[in-house]
A protein has these predicted regions:
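Intrinsic-disorder/low-complexity coil detector
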Residues: 1, 26-31, 92, 120, ...
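N-terminal strand-loop-strand
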Residues: 1-36, 64
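Residue-level detector of intrinsically disordered, flexible termini
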Residues: 7-10, 89, 115, 136
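General helical structural elements
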Residues: 13, 27, 46, 58-61, ...
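Residue-level signal for pocket-adjacent positions within structured domains
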Residues: 26, 30-32, 37, 70, ...
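Unchanged
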Residues: 40-66, 73-127
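Charged phosphate-binding loop/patch that engages nucleotide di/tri-phosphates or the phosphate backbone
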Residues: 126-139
Length: 139
């Protein structure tokens, strides 16, 4: 696994439903006002998985078990400064979404069907594609 990466995102799935949030609508942030998945930028010397899990805790108040990760992939050179980004998929137990305590980033959160997220015109396009990559590898 490369030691340099810019960040990680994670699709948190439960019975075909997906945890999402609407980003703040600020011109100073990437992808303002679009639907997003948990995750964000690397801090200190954390691994990509540690980054994704920490961001999920910070943004949604949910601690994910690393054993729930069912897929991971590095996307070379697609992050800040040309660094890699990582994308994870976690299949979580029923009831996990009931534990959400939404943090202070974003306007609101929502659980949607995977199909609805993939069809959203106002979702971050490369995250929709990464979720499609997972689905094509796990039909």
């Amino acid at each position: 696994m490369p030691t340099l990466f810019s960040g990680a995102k994670i699709a948190v799935l439960c019975d075909g439903r997906l945890l999402t949030y609407l980003r703040d609508d600020l011109p100073t942030i990437p992808w303002p006002g679009l639907w997003d998945l948990p995750g964000g930028g690397r801090e200190d010397a954390e691994t990509p998985l540690q980054c994704a899990l920490r961001e999920t805790r910070e943004e949604f108040g949910v601690s994910l078990d690393p054993a729930w990760i069912v897929w991971e992939r590095a996307y070379a050179g697609q992050g800040m400064n040309g660094l890699d980004t990582w994308f994870y998929v976690a299949e979580v137990p029923v009831g996990t979404f009931d534990q959400v305590v939404f943090g202070d980033e974003g306007q609101r959160w929502m659980v949607s069907s995977v199909e609805a997220f993939l069809a959203m015109p106002d979702a971050i396009p490369h995250l929709q594609q990464r979720l499609r990559d997972f689905l094509s590898a796990h039909p």
